[in-house]
Amino acid sequence: MKIAQIAPLYESVPPKYYGGTERVVSWLTEELVRQGHDVTLFASGDSETSAKLVPGSPRSLRLDKGCIDQLAHHILMLENFYQRAGDFDVAHFHVDYLHYPLTRRQLTSHVTTLHGRLDIPDLQPLYREFSDMPVVSISNAQREPLPDANWQGTVYHGLPRDLFSFHPEPGSYFAFLGRISPEKRVDRAIEIARRVGIPLKIAAKIDAIDQQYFKAVVEPLLPEPFVEYIGEVGGREKEKFLGNAFALLFPIDWPEPFGLVMIEAMACGTPIIAYRRGSVPEVMEEDETGFMVTNLREAVAAAKKISGLSRRRCRDVFEERFTAERMVKDYLRIYDGMAQANTAAAGG
């Protein structure tokens, strides 16, 4: 099958550090190529892939200090795709809704994975207008605000089976990995660690929009002797960070669409303490891969008993549910359905 993957340009595919969407696009693309499909990846020029790469920008836009208007690069990339859309059996978009006016008018089968939160009022009229656009959710919880969208299915993220190795013996610290932002609540993670008496290591990026939150809420807590902020991590450094952790703290305060770090932790054998929001009940298995909580008191109690969980079971759940092979199998089912429907509509 000839497949186009159209990625955001904010990060490279895969990203050097933080970047959940681009990371998933990379895993999906590489597994499709491994299975023999003809894949073209539209992404930033510093992306690394075994697919055919069509650069939409010279490098990832977040790391390009000279880039002022990121949207301009995305529009040019979409026009580039449109000019060769007939070369593909299926086009898979990961750029939110930017392409909807274009894809509504093209004949190539297409589907869009929605990677972000959908409980934003501004999205309601947009999805009423573009209710014909075929979309995929990354959790069932994510799609709840848009029940009437043209859902083709839910496909949970998956990562390569051998990307992270199993770490049977934990270290002596809690891990927090992600973005420093109000909805990720690293301040909660610090308080949990303080009450339990276990050190916390924070590996996270800080976007410009979150600098005020960092300065006002998080930075005053960093001098605590049990807190270590190490910045962004990637690759083997990330595996070591997660795999050696006593547990991953995921104290979110928003309707998390998926939470990629949870399955990355599972792949290492590291259990999770997560607030029961958004996708968390779909991704985690209570009393097996960790504990779900609703408040600080429950989080502290969970942290005190997390050592009783099997790290091997965490790894097993990852292998059973969250590999790239399973993700590709699910997407191929959707691609096939879209292509067949398009052929039937064209009278083929």
Where are these regions (language model features)?
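Catalytic cores of nucleotide-sugar-dependent glycosyltransferases that transfer UDP/GDP/TDP-activated
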Residues: 1-348
